[in-house]
Amino acid sequence: MSKKTSPSMDSWLKEAKAHESAPKIGMYLTHNGIVRKSAKAKVRQGAADTRPVVGMQFSYNQEAVDAIIAETYKLDGIFYIKVWLNEGKLSVGDDIMYVLIGGDIRPHVVDALQYLVRRIKNECVTEIELY
């Protein structure tokens, strides 16, 4: 499995603004997760004895992602969602995930983005850091 070509956020936004839901949307918010050099244990738990990351083996469960997207649409004020996930062996700086979410007002969109990304990261993906 090899990594994918990253999407164009400009194209995504153009598509979203042409979608039938666009008249209800007052805000679009994007997320672009990338492979970083600092190990997850260092960033999240403050572990001092971690080696630099040189890459990541990344995979995901598409059915689980689709189910979480469907649940996110049930949140207040959310009318548009698009998600792209990479796969395979990734290098530092490579894109892992893109999310575009559109909704009526900022609090709804910010909360929905956090909900969606957290659930995808915690329930749908496998990230193996390479050293």
Where are the predicted features?
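N-terminal, polar/charged subdomain of small-to-medium soluble alpha/beta proteins
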Residues: 1-95, 102-105, 110-131
